[in-house]
Structure formats: structure tokens, C-alpha cells
């Protein structure tokens, strides 16, 4: 529960930061929440009964509220749209579904879109630069925008591994045939989700289908620690 809900907080904050409805006010809140999650979520997860762990849990409660203030004003994006449908269909905890999607959605949103999302104060596509800003704020390598995006994706994946989270839908014990039979319907529903309009990249339904395909299983052979997590969640 600590890992699932903590990664939901992270997704709230990151999506709010790159939203087309983001402002100077929400950016400050979102960035602070992101930094707090990376600092305190592992401590909260590992040391619940220690003094450090109890302080970390308090900090995570604060981070959750701060991220909530950010996304209540800036709203969310397709990460949540996809997670809503994925979790509902296959009974995957909400934060876990968000976490599995997050690295893939960051990569997707950081790519120059074929269709731009529009909002009066969102004059140009800046999602890739804002992901790189997050990487810099976390002390990650970000000498270029591309390096910053890559560093952030890697940091999210490393955090998930540290929390013993499944990295794929397959690792959650979902049968491949059942999953692939549902994803086109889920993608269409995700496109119509209330969170989609604030996403920095206006998605095509086919692109959402592809994200669902990409998260089913690892592109490379599953490592030992990932195999162990998959067995625990089967």
C-alpha cells in the first residue's frame, strides 16, 4: 500500500507539472512533491517502525497533499486516463497501474507530437523540457533535454525496483490473451477520459493502444529481481 500510494503521488505531481494547464503556482507545488517522493518514499517503505520511517511517512502525507493541490488546479494527463481503465478492467491497484505506465508515458509525452494540445496559456510544446527540469531538480544528468528525459525515466524505474514493484502488466499476473483482447476498447475509453484533455501531447487512440502493448512485458529478458516480483504478484 505504501509503494502503490506513494507512486500515485509521484504520478500526480509529474502529470501536473507537464499539464497544459500548469502555472507558476502549480509548478512550484508539483516540483516540491516530486522531490519529496524521491527522498522520503523509500524510507517510508523500508522503515515503517523506525523513527526515520515515521518521519518519512509524515513527509509522504504532506507530499500527497501538495501534489493534490497541484493537480487540482493543473489537472492530470493520459497516464491517469490509461491507468483508470487498466486498473478497473484487471483489478490492478491504481497507484501500481500508474507506476507501470509512468516511464512509458514520459517517453511518449517527451516526443514531438503530431497533434498539439491547445490551451490559452500553453503556447508551445514544452513537455520534454519540463521533464528535463525535473531531472535537474533531482540532481540527475540532464546536460541536454534528451538526457534529462532519459535520466528521469531511469530514476522512476529504479525507484519502482527499490519498492519491489512489478514493472509490467504481465508481472501482475494478467494473461496475455485476455489483456490484448481488451486493450483497443480500453484505449478508446482512455481517450474519452476526463484527464486526457490536459495532456501535453494530444493522443491518437492508436498511440494509446501502443502504450498498452508496450507495458505488457519487458522488451528485454526479465532480470532475476523482476522475475521474483512477478512470482510474488502472480
Task: Give names to the regions the model predicted.
Residues 1-74:
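Carboxylate- and glycine-rich phosphate/diphosphate-binding segment that chelates Mg2+/Mn2+
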Amino acid at each position: 500500500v505504501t509503494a502503490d500510494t506513494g507512486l500515485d503521488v509521484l504520478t500526480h505531481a509529474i502529470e501536473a507539472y507537464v499539464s497544459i494547464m500548469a502555472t507558476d503556482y502549480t509548478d512550484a507545488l508539483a516540483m516540491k512533491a516530486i522531490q519529496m517522493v524521491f527522498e522520503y518514499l523509500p524510507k517510508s517503505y523500508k522503515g515503517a517502525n523506525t523513527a526515520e520511517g515515521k518521519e518519512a511517512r509524515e513527509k509522504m502525507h504532506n507530499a500527497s497533499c501538495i501534489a493534490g493541490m497541484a493537480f487540482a488546479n493543473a489537472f492530470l494527463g493520459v497516464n491517469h486516463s490509461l491507468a483508470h481503465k487498466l486498473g478497473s478492467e484487471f483489478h490492478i491497484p491504481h497507484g501500481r497501474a500508474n507506476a507501470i505506465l509512468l516511464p512509458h508515458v514520459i517517453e511518449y509525452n517527451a516526443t514531438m507530437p503530431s497533434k498539439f494540445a491547445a490551451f490559452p496559456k500553453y503556447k508551445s510544446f514544452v513537455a520534454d523540457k519540463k521533464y528535463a527540469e525535473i531531472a535537474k531538480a533531482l540532481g540527475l544528468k540532464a546536460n541536454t533535454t534528451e538526457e534529462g528525459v532519459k535520466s528521469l525515466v531511469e530514476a522512476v524505474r529504479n525507484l519502482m525496483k527499490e519498492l519491489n514493484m512489478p514493472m509490467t502488466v504481465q508481472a501482475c499476473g494478467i494473461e496475455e490473451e485476455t489483456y490484448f483482447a481488451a486493450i483497443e476498447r480500453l484505449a478508446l475509453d482512455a481517450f474519452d477520459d476526463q484527464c486526457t484533455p490536459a495532456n501535453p501531447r494530444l493522443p491518437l487512440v492508436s498511440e494509446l493502444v501502443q502504450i498498452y502493448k508496450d507495458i505488457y512485458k519487458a522488451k528485454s529478458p526479465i532480470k532475476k529481481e523482476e522475475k521474483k516480483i512477478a512470482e510474488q504478484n502472480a
